[in-house]
């Protein structure tokens, strides 16, 4: 299988999570509580550097793409437009109820609600979701979502090109039955990801991605011209309960730069834009002084994208060398690394699970506000193995500044770090595919991780389970006892026992094995124009476009 589009965290934009996946804050009451808000066209500005890659749900892997798809997507299950803890509670959307697994945990049966229709008027049947799953598995698509469907019975035969439909996916009328090779309590959460939006049963395979096609969500894409525009309008046959106040969205993809995106919104030429969080804190823009934070039009909310320094365990320096990996963790001054991008951009962390996830346990494994050099030097002594390391970072200004800070900090424990700028965004699928390439000569890599659905599996297992070696497990961490502990946790049903098991894994991995050095979790930053009714601004933590309304 080609893993060039492995699922990754994307940009300093912790989107994945936001789109129907979680609610981390709300500027005001949700538009969902209001019956009607006057229509109008909501204007969006995007730039190529932080724009969309595809509008095909099987292929999309950037935050803005998922943000737009959230307006058009109808899923079996989704999450409410509410702040946590309610925002983490899975609820049915097209499905009539959240499914209960069979006694052996390997079969899920979804019964669809009546009333959902595509924008061409055709009814949504179970075949729409079967097609979505099989498109993700199709080798011609190279979908980053394939890792969420690997354990469906027959998935391997589709991925290998031997058949076009997984035998474990059976659609009949309004009933969808999915059989798995092993128990997977997180399977309903996976079905809430954007990869499994309802699509027309005849939607063809296209490695370049389908653009404008019938959708079953509140809106649908009328026109898409890459690098130019996207036109989205109301689905006249929408049969769901999601808010949909505006008449549609006009998306201009031609902003000259990330700064231009923000400037367009600030002066009212656009109502919202998506760009790197750090751009908003450029002092020349003066947004904090003009709007304040979380008061009027400008919002900073805790996000779910982790920035980390990954260790390459396939190379001699860090392979079978947990002492040096822990030494690096103690030598880092995380607060200083955060300050390189602006103090409001993120919050430092030393663990792999976000603190807003249910069950999180703060273990204070490593210092956040300073380096602990005495302890770091003791751990590094005798473990430096030549004391030279190659650090990959994106070649743009802020990542390079962070890379040089890391170089200076690790010099304190005797490690000579060469910072290598890579002209690929450090949150892009291409960057993570490069890290996963066998023989790629990196020892340390600065990157970002954001889940496609809310479950600790999406942080712990996807990053560190040996089943995902060469894909999302780009560190190549492989520990038999820890793998067994991860898989036991994955088999637990949703609830406090599962949360506690993953909290223990999080602490064990960070404290004892350190396959990566967690640095911080990015905040999500939102600026809206003066045309936007702030009573309809719902932050999940990215702006919920379906809920917006205009004054």
Where are these regions (language model features)?
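Long beta-strand-rich cores associated with HINT superfamily self-processing modules
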Residues: 526-551
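Ligand-site clamp/hinge motif
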Residues: 205-207, 237-286, 416
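Periplasmic-binding protein-like
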Residues: 314-357, 401-402, 508-518
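Extracytoplasmic/peripheral linker and loop segments enriched in polar/acidic and small residues
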Residues: 33-35, 169, 295, 326, ...
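Structural transition elements
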Residues: 343-381, 394-401
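N-terminal lobe/hinge region of extracytoplasmic solute-binding protein
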Residues: 45-103, 212-215
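Surface-exposed binding/hinge segments that line
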Residues: 109-111, 128-130, 135-201
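Gly/Pro-rich hinge or "lid" segments in bacterial periplasmic/extracellular proteins
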Residues: 80-85, 180-248, 259
């Amino acid at each position: 299988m080609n893993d060039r589009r492995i699922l990754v965290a994307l940009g300093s934009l912790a989107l994945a999570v936001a789109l129907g996946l979680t609610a981390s804050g709300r500027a005001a009451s949700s538009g969902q509580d209001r019956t009607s808000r006057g229509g109008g066209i909501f204007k969006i500005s995007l730039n190529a550097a932080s724009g969309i890659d595809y509008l095909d749900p099987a292929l999309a892997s950037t935050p803005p793409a998922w943000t737009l798809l959230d307006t058009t997507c109808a899923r079996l299950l989704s999450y409410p437009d509410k702040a946590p803890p309610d925002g983490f509670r899975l609820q049915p959307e097209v499905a009539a109820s959240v499914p209960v697994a069979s006694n052996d945990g390997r079969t899920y049966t979804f019964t669809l609600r009546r009333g959902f229709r595509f924008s061409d008027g055709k009814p949504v049947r179970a075949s729409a979701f079967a097609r979505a799953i099989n498109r993700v598995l199709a080798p011609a698509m190279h979908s980053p979502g394939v890792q969420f469907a690997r354990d469906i019975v027959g998935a391997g035969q589709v991925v290998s090109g031997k058949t076009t439909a997984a035998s474990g996916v059976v659609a009949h009328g309004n009933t969808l039955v999915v059989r798995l090779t092993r128990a997977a309590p997180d399977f309903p959460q996976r079905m809430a990801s954007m990869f499994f939006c309802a699509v027309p049963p005849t939607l063809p395979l296209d490695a370049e991605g389908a653009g404008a096609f019938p959708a079953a969500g509140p809106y649908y894409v009328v026109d898409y011209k890459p690098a130019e525009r996207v036109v989205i309008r109301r689905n006249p046959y929408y049969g769901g309960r999601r808010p949909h106040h505006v008449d549609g969205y006009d998306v201009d993809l031609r902003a000259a730069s990330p700064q231009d995106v923000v400037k367009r919104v600030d002066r009212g030429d656009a109502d919202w834009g998506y760009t790197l969080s750090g751009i908003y804190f450029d002092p020349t823009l003066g947004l904090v002084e003009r709007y304040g934070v979380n008061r009027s039009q400008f919002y900073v909310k805790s996000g779910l994208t982790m920035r980390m320094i990954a260790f390459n365990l396939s190379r001699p320096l860090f392979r079978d060398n947990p002492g040096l990996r822990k030494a690096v963790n103690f030598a880092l001054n995380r607060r200083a690394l955060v300050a390189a991008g602006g103090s409001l951009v993120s919050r430092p962390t030393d663990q792999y699970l976000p603190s807003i996830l249910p069950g999180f346990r703060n273990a204070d494994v490593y210092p956040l506000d300073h380096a602990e050099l005495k302890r770091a030097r003791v751990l590094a002594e005798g473990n430096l193995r030549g004391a030279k390391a190659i650090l990959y970072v994106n070649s743009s200004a802020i990542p390079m500044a962070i890379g040089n800070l890391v170089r200076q900090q690790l010099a304190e424990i005797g490690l000579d770090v060469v910072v290598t700028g890579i002209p690929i965004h450090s949150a892009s699928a291409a960057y993570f595919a490069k890290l996963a390439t066998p023989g790629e000569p990196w020892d340390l890599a600065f990157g970002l991780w954001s889940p496609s659905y809310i479950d600790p599996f999406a942080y712990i297992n996807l990053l560190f389970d040996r089943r995902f070696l060469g894909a999302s497990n780009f560190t190549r961490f492989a520990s038999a006892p820890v793998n067994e502990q991860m898989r036991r946790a994955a088999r637990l049903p949703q609830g406090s026992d599962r949360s506690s098991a993953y909290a223990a894994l999080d602490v064990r991995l960070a404290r004892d094995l350190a396959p990566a050095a967690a640095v911080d979790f990015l905040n999500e930053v939102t600026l809206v124009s003066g045309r936007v009714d702030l009573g309809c601004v719902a932050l999940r933590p990215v702006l919920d476009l379906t809920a917006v309304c205009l004054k």
